[in-house]
A protein has these predicted regions:
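Conserved, single-site charged/polar hotspot
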Residues: 1-196
Length: 196
């Protein structure tokens, strides 16, 4: 939740335009809720996908029938889709508690259904992609690694945990003509939108 003063600071001169859009969307959907089998859903969301959303089993070790990995091709090419982060090998060793000398000491073992790193071996120690993302401050657990001198370069796709609705994907879907109901039902599999 953001206060009006926080929104004014964030949006600057565009505050009135954006605020009216938000207000219009809220009023148009007033009283509507998303449900799955008669129960309210946990409407998780994140910034930008890598082209697919993620199943929460890989992120938080739980599952929900409406939070399945789905295609989100609309994110490809958006401003937060790709990023790189360069980390000195010495810093990587310290943050992960390993002792590697080169990128050859890093091996991606498996990927998730959403195309992110599931299991990775770094200096003989096994990590999940989510752990590496959190420990190294990466935008996403969909990453590749390369070496540049005494640094490891992580190239990521997407931004966030990847579970639920992609904000940038939803925005691009809206620009392509999808309505809010179609967008929500795409990202939250099998839900109904009910007026309460």
């Amino acid at each position: 939740y953001k206060t009006n003063s926080e929104l004014k600071s964030m949006w600057g001169e565009s505050f009135n335009t954006y605020y009216e859009k938000v207000k219009k969307a809220v009023m148009a959907t007033k009283g509507e809720v998303m449900m799955y089998n008669g129960k309210y859903i946990d409407a998780l969301y994140f910034s930008t996908s890598n082209g697919r959303t993620e199943d929460p089993i890989y992120v938080w070790n739980y599952s929900a029938p409406y939070l399945k990995s789905v295609d989100s091709k609309w994110d490809i090419g958006t401003k937060f889709f790709n990023a790189t982060k360069t980390i000195p090998i010495s810093e990587l060793n310290q943050k992960l508690g390993v002792n590697i000398n080169s990128v050859n000491d890093i091996q991606i073992k498996s990927q998730t259904t959403g195309g992110r790193v599931n299991s990775i071996i770094i200096g003989g120690k096994e990590f999940t992609g989510v752990n590496v993302r959190m420990l190294l401050g990466l935008r996403s657990s969909d990453f590749t690694v390369a070496e540049n001198g005494s640094n490891i370069v992580f190239t990521t796709k997407g931004w966030g945990h990847g579970v639920g609705m992609s904000q940038y994907g939803a925005n691009e879907m809206a620009k392509a003509g999808y309505n809010y109901s179609q967008i929500l039902k795409h990202y939250y599999t099998g839900i109904t939108i009910v007026k309460k």
